[in-house]
Design a protein with these regions (language model features):
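Switch/connector loops and helix/strand junctions flanking conserved nucleotide-binding motifs
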Residues: 126-129
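Polybasic/polar functional segments that serve as interface/processing modules
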Residues: 10-62, 70-108, 122-123, 133-146
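Active-site beta-strand termini and strand-to-loop segments that position acidic
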Residues: 110-112
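Conserved acidic residues
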Residues: 64, 114
Length: 146
């Protein structure tokens, strides 16, 4: 039986660093694709005031990104949630680990492990002001689609 040696199994620090760098970059690309598909799902159903909070530079966070948006009615909040699910699943095959808030559809949270999605009614979003909880995060506003 022939022994095949893979460079990332060697113990040199340079090789470990390169392997870590490669895997980190791959994870970042996967996360970026996930965030992109989440935004597409929101925009497909006219979700508004999309904000992406990048938490990657903050220690001890529960995830790497928050994607926050709003719908104008409980039914729109539910439809946005379904659209996100479809958009992500078609592109990546991923499903959220959990979805909470469907019962009253005032605030629905979707957990994609590294990315948490929050879909609010405007008054609920204003009350909780979740963006302010992460004021030290890099916040990116995504323009509304008319």
């Amino acid at each position: 039986m022939e022994h095949i040696s893979y460079p990332f199994f060697h113990s040199s620090n340079k090789t470990k660093y390169l392997c870590t760098l490669f895997l980190t970059k791959k994870r970042m690309n996967i996360r970026n694709e996930l965030v992109k598909k989440i935004i597409e799902g929101i925009q497909d159903k006219k979700g508004q005031k999309i904000v992406v909070a990048d938490l990657t530079e903050i220690e001890d966070t529960i995830c790497n990104y928050f994607v926050i948006c709003q719908g104008n009615s409980p039914s729109q909040v539910s439809v946005i949630t379904d659209s996100i699910w479809d958009s992500v699943h078609k592109a990546t095959g991923d499903k959220p680990l959990a979805i909470d808030g469907f019962r009253n559809a005032q605030w629905i949270a979707m957990d994609y492990s590294d990315v948490l999605v929050h879909i609010f009614l405007p008054e609920v979003r204003e009350f909780y002001n979740i963006e302010n909880l992460w004021a030290d995060a890099k916040l990116t506003s995504i323009p509304d689609i008319d």
